Regions:
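Alpha-helical segment of the N-proximal tetratricopeptide repeat
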Residues: 1-33
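Short solvent-exposed coil/turn linkers within tandem alpha-helical repeat scaffolds
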Residues: 30-36, 67-73, 102-112
Length: 120
């Protein structure tokens, strides 16, 4: 399983997001309970985010939160959801997401970054 994950992450790190999406999806289908699964889900979502496919990124980041509630990347997932909502013009959703981030993870770096977001 580690090999599949590392190949997908290598594609992600090199900006080959479409290949990375396929790799992370394969990893998650084959090894859903692996210790790397929460990271794979986050990076899968981030592939869509980095391609500015925000409507696809949001539900993938939400899966990080819903399926891996203790994942270390949850604050960053919420931050990226807020940015994706902003990019889609959904300011109310962005504001709500930042509020959730503040409540759940008040001392995280993602929360600090979210304070700098300008939400109209």
């Amino acid at each position: 399983p580690t090999e599949v994950y590392l190949q997908a992450f290598g594609d992600y790190a090199s900006g080959r997001y479409q290949s990375a999406v396929l790799g992370f999806e394969t990893f998650l289908q084959r090894f859903p309970n692996n210790s790397y699964a929460s990271n794979a889900q986050f990076w899968l979502a981030d592939c869509y985010f980095n391609q500015q496919q925000y409507a696809l990124a949001i539900p993938q980041f939400e899966r990080v939160l819903n399926e891996y509630s203790a994942a270390a990347k949850n604050p960053e997932a919420l931050y990226k959801i807020a940015i994706a909502h902003l990019q889609l013009g959904a300011t109310d959703e962005a504001r709500q997401t930042v509020d959730i981030l503040n409540q759940r993870y008040p001392k995280s770096k993602a929360t600090q970054k979210a304070q700098e977001l300008v939400i109209p």
